[in-house]
């Protein structure tokens, strides 16, 4: 749709030679509407869905984490978490159509979607680094994960490894405190790793994932839920342009003084190439 409107908009602009430098051409007005629709109906709605789904996944992992301590993890708990993970992952893949703005400026994509997962590092964490795992189990576990784990252990793929095996949900008993991992490949034997430790890791990493997604959401939408904005402020994470404007406002006001886009067509171009 943007491509079609861009063609007609540019044609309209080229036929509007009488417009003065202080006027907005009819073509640019049309393109501004396209940009506003893209921000409101595509980018913001996608990030909202992603934020909601990662929050639900985080809450479900909290349930499993708590149940793990009493060896009470059920298969339904794990299956529900896997369903929520798939939904969150699908929302993220939809957002990859516009990895620009905040996603690029704050390096969020590599932070939450680096591949492959470093299984050797994960083994060393879960089997050989009990002090760090215990730090991940604190109230600020997501912050500890963000600061200490590195991109190869953060994001979707680390959580996926804990929840799934060979594309299907893990056996629930493996995620209990008295459970052990059945993974034993390529010289990495996770059987000495407790299910409780795995859930501590997954829950902390999911907290960091959720916070990173909240950063995407609040960066584009100045009307994002206040609780999400409060989390950004409490973590002292930047989530706006240096002007203080949201990325959505900045794009909607392309060509207007204060926007980083010098013209409407520059903003359209950024959308089409997914950059800027």
Please tell me what each predicted stretch does:
Residues 14-17:
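Bacterial signal peptide processing site
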Residues 20-276:
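Mature extracytoplasmic or organellar-lumen-exposed domains after removal of signal/transit peptides
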Residues 1-5:
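Sec-dependent N-terminal signal peptides
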Residues 8-12:
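C-terminal motif of bacterial Sec signal peptides marking the signal peptidase cleavage site
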